[in-house]
Amino acid sequence: MTVITVSLEKKQYQVKIDRRLHQEIGQAVSLVWTPRRIALLTDSHVGPLYLTAVQQQLEMSGFEVLPLQVPAGESSKSLKTVGELIGKMAEKGFTRDDGLIALGGGVIGDLGGVVASLYMRGIALIQIATSLTAQVDSSVGGKTAINLSHTKNIAGTFYQPDLVLVDPTYLDTLADRDLVEGYAEVVKTSVLAGGSFFDLTGRIYGVTDIRDNAEELSTRAVAYKAQVVMADEKEAGQRQFLNFGHTIGHAIELLAHGELRHGEAVAIGMIAMSSRMTRDGLTPASLTAALRARLETVDLPTTSDLIGTPAFFKHMVNDKKNRGGRLNLVVLKDIGQPMIVQKAIVDMPDFINENEGNNR
């Protein structure tokens, strides 16, 4: 078992990575929580596969479990769903001494984090990550969020879990497309980290390679993210680097109305930004080519006709990284050398469209 400790100013917790964790959930939870009521949140995809087994293990370990299931997909990351879940927990008499476990991928992790942070001003939270996106990225670091109609992840909190469990065997039931979109976050982290991690993603050529190397990919990605989060928990500095590809990615993800997965949109965003900065002479052309190759070899998209449209820029204005009319854009000086470039929102159409031929 790999154990990565996240040590913050006011909290410390462990991320455990092992292929046997799905059989040891009750024991793992008992090490950090005393017996209590647990709201076990999942979705309509993960629930039929794993909810019963997890619930039984928790109950055998002395916990009282309230199973909560929401429809799978981004539509559940809403204020309406948050209100419904909080209402169900209140009806069952949950108190501040109880807890919530998010059993699922990025959507459930985000949603569960928001609910846990808001219920009675905060109850204990554990993340059990079942998708690659969650295992390598979203379950670690305490960022939680829901969507409003025109903006992704616009309402949320920083709320750290008490424990994160990552079992790569959960990926066995994940569809190839869902696996690959999570791999986009792995590539992102590897180019930020550089070194042997970036070399590793250069040896991944397809879905089989992702599955075969899932444990190492998760370990490398979580170790890097934990290091960044410990240095900058609230995203005041270097944690912003983890947003590489996301400013453009979030905008086109919303415009695609479900046709693009999150990781697919991030892949497009990374190449769009790197190509633009290569044109300016900041990002080496060889880096952009290496990044593109890592994404395209697993069939991730790297272009979109949605970039540069009026609706695209409207979504960028609403981006949560908009600070005083300026966007902090993450760009790469080299492998393992991210930096922030500030651009005024009003200048973004010229900045993006000047290079649109390379992105369409």
UniProtKB/Swiss-Prot annotation:
Question: What Gene Ontology cellular-component terms does the record carry?
Answer: cytoplasm
What name appears for this protein in its UniProt entry? 3-dehydroquinate synthase
Residues bound to NAD(+) are 106-110, 130-131, 143, 152
EC number(s) from the headed UniProt entry: 4.2.3.4
InterPro entries given in the database record:
Dehydroquinate_synthase, DHQ_synth_AroB, DHQ_synth_fam, DHQS/DOIS_N, DHQS_C
Required cofactors, per record?
Answer: Co(2+); Zn(2+); NAD(+)
Q: Which residues bind Zn(2+)?
A: 185, 246, 262
- Chief subcellular location equals cytoplasm
Q: Which residues form the signal peptide?
A: none
In the UniProt record, what gene is named as encoding this protein?
aroB
What job does this protein perform? Answer: Catalyzes the conversion of 3-deoxy-D-arabino-heptulosonate 7-phosphate (DAHP) to dehydroquinate (DHQ).
